[in-house]
Amino acid sequence: MLFGYLVGFLAADPEERMTSGGKRVVVLRLGVKSRVGSKDETVWCRCNIWNNRYDKMIPYLKKGSSVIVAGELSVESYMGRDGSPQASISVSVDTLKFNSGSSRPESRGSDEGRQRSNDNVSLGFEGESLDTEIALDKEVYAGFGEDQQYASEDVPF
C-alpha cells in the first residue's frame, strides 16, 4: 500500500457521484504545487471520499479551498486526447483537514489571526501534528526547494 499526504488547492467545487453499485463518492480535484529545479509545476490529483465520510465538511469546501489530504495513493493510466498514454494520481481519502496555513494572498488574514487559527492543526493521527507556522511564510511546495534533508543519490527512483 502506498500512503501519502497531499497539500493543495481545490480546482473545482466537490462533485457527488454514485457508482453503478449504488455507493456514494465525493470527488475532489486537487492541485498540488511542486518544484523541479527552478521550475514550478502543478500535479493534479483526484481525491475520492467514499460513503458519508466528512459530510459535515463538504459544504464548506469550495473551488480554491486549501486542504490537507491523507490516504492511499494509486496511479491510473488512460489514453490522452492525442492518443498518447497518460497517468493520473488518485487518492482514497482517509483524512481530510482544512489548511489554515494557506499561501494564497487573498486567503491570508493578519499574522495574529493566522497564529490563532494554527494552534490546533493536526493530521488526525495519534501524537502526530503539523507545524504550519513553519510553512506560513513559504510557498506550499513539496520539500520547500533547497531545504531537503537527503542527498539525491538516497532517492531509490
From Swiss-Prot:
InterPro entries: NA-bd_OB-fold, Primosome_PriB/ssb, ssDNA-bd
Keywords: DNA-binding
GO terms, biological process: DNA replication
Biased amino acid composition, Basic and acidic residues: 105-117
Keyword flag DNA damage: no
GO MF terms, alphabetically ordered: single-stranded DNA binding
Record keyword Ribonucleoprotein present: no
Record domain SSB: where: 1-100
Residues passing through the membrane, by range: none
Region called Disordered, residue ranges: 97-126
GO cellular component: nucleoid
UniProt-listed HAMAP family: SSB (MF_00984)
Protein name, per record: Single-stranded DNA-binding protein
Gene transcribed to yield this protein: ssb
